[in-house]
Amino acid sequence: MSETLKRLSEVIESRKPANGGDPEKSYVARLFVKGDDAILKKIGEEATELVMAAKDARVSADKSKVLYECADLWFHSMVLLAQFDLTPQDVLDELARREGISGIEEKASRTAD
């Protein structure tokens, strides 16, 4: 796993109130205290901002906002992973598991819940 992702994951984990994160001093700790809905709302906002940045980049040819908004989406997705005691490595492992499998085949192999 990238050292940057590893360090960021560790910082996010340290912001959990159970690990001493203070919601008065830490944005991430505040998200953890507010719970799943607050984190999911933020992910929805960031996903929308990424979509809009990508549309704007097609017109302006300026990709910097796409990068910025994608970083925000990744960050908040990492907060959600931590909320469920998952890590970026878990995502990388899942991607590796899917490697070489067509998307159609992978989707068909899922069991209905």
UniProtKB/Swiss-Prot annotation:
GO terms for molecular function: ATP binding; phosphoribosyl-ATP diphosphatase activity. Its EC number is 3.6.1.31. Pathway: Amino-acid biosynthesis; L-histidine biosynthesis; L-histidine from 5-phospho-alpha-D-ribose 1-diphosphate: step 2/9. Keywords: Amino-acid biosynthesis, ATP-binding, Cytoplasm, Histidine biosynthesis, Hydrolase, Nucleotide-binding. It is found in: Cytoplasm. One of its GO terms (cellular component) is cytoplasm. One of its GO terms (biological process) is L-histidine biosynthetic process. CDD domains: NTP-PPase_HisIE_like. It catalyses: 1-(5-phospho-beta-D-ribosyl)-ATP + H2O = 1-(5-phospho-beta-D-ribosyl)-5'-AMP + diphosphate + H(+). Disulfide bonds: none annotated. HAMAP family: HisE. Belongs to the PRA-PH family. This is Phosphoribosyl-ATP pyrophosphatase. It comes from Herminiimonas arsenicoxydans.
